[in-house]
Amino acid sequence: MKWKEQAVILGTRQYGETSIILEVMTRQHGRYMGIVKGGHSRRMAGLLQPGNFVEAEWWARLDEHLGLFRLEALDLYAARLILLPEALYALQLIVFHLRLLPERDPYPSLYDILHLFMQNFDESFVNAELLVRFEMRLLEELGFGLDLSRCAATGRQERLFYVSPKSGRAVCEEAGRPWKEKLLTLPQFLVRRAIRPVNFSDIINGFILTGFFLMRHVWEPRGIKQPSVRVNLIQLFERRFRM
């Protein structure tokens, strides 16, 4: 068995005295692991950092085997990532979420957002928006996607300002006004893609929205608390956006 594809490095762990087990995310093969022989060497250390973009070649005698990786560097983002705390936290959060998904199952839309994030990690607003979109897509991939296409009460497709915490469906301004204290705010960049720039309150409301449904459907059923890296990241965004 053999494949070759571009990949983002997610993490490593030691394997024996000189090798490592590498974890990557690819578009066509999903989250994949394999052995990198000699990966524990100083020469390989810079290449194998989380966030780096590589050409990964994997092969094994049988598909169910762990297999071996051969890598070629494409974009070594990691050296710049460590200079930006919010970008580093963001990558750690993405990796946390990707590990909730089955290994070796393709999730091309999540990979595309991850790749776009890596290309824009030094732009805070783009970075934050992509993270909200990533969490929205994660909910969808796990079977808990929100329906933001029309108002749950009236069927209208305009002025969708809220989301019902019970149904996960959008609610328009008119229908939601009497109940707005009990509804979640719907960030407009999730329903009106042309909005630029995305504003601070929309970003925070986006994290509140995705966090509510991730807690209900993903974290609590698995006995997981909201990851501390997510809390720290949102606090960093708040400080940066208010400067």
From Swiss-Prot:
Transmembrane segments: none annotated. GO terms for biological process: DNA recombination; double-strand break repair. Keywords: DNA damage, DNA recombination, DNA repair. The keyword Metal-binding does not apply. GO terms for cellular component: bacterial nucleoid. Pfam families: RecO_C, RecO_N. The keyword Zinc does not apply. PANTHER family: DNA REPAIR PROTEIN RECO. Belongs to the RecO family. NCBIfam families: reco. Involved in DNA repair and RecF pathway recombination. HAMAP family: RecO. This is DNA repair protein RecO.
